Regions:
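N-terminal presequence-like segments and the immediate start of the first folded domain
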Residues: 1-76, 80, 84-96, 104-151
Length: 151
């Protein structure tokens, strides 16, 4: 497959319209994306279920599989935001970095599996251009590691 859109079609993904980032009447004082030179920085997106912010903690009310799907769904919204910013997803030269914030129970250790939902989608859609650096922030580190550092 040659284009991002052919890959999206093969994955049966239709990009959504990007709703304004308003939650419960709160209107943020930031933009959904900012372009500077050849880089585009995206604001965070909340996971949603049935059009409303997804609520709960991984390892309590939400399973790893549900979290992985939620991360994938957020990545689809990210693609829609990039589409809005660029007009054409084929213009994306590289996904450089992704940060995933995971709300989890204290004993949940599979945050990396949740984040993989988004990472896998970006690689499926962009191929090698979708391979990226990633930071996953949680209350507890994967593999119970006591220290972690991002570069």
């Amino acid at each position: 497959m040659n284009t991002v859109y052919e890959r999206l079609n093969a994955l049966q993904i239709k990009l959504p319209e990007i709703p304004p980032p308003v939650v419960d009447g709160y209107v943020p004082l930031f933009e959904p994306f900012v372009r500077t030179g050849n880089l585009i920085y995206l604001s965070g997106r909340l996971a949603k279920k049935d059009g409303k912010p997804y609520s709960g903690k991984l390892g309590q009310q939400i399973t790893t599989a549900e979290g992985r799907q939620a991360a994938r769904d957020v990545a689809i919204e990210v693609l829609a935001t990039l589409q809005t910013a660029l007009g054409d997803l084929n213009k994306v030269k590289r996904i450089v970095k992704m940060t995933v914030l995971v709300n989890s129970a204290p004993d949940f250790t599979e945050s990396h599996e949740v984040a993989n939902g988004a990472s896998k989608l970006l690689c499926e859609v962009f191929g090698e251009r979708g391979a990226h650096a990633r930071t996953t922030l949680v209350g507890r580190r994967s593999h119970s590691a006591p220290v972690w550092k991002s570069r």
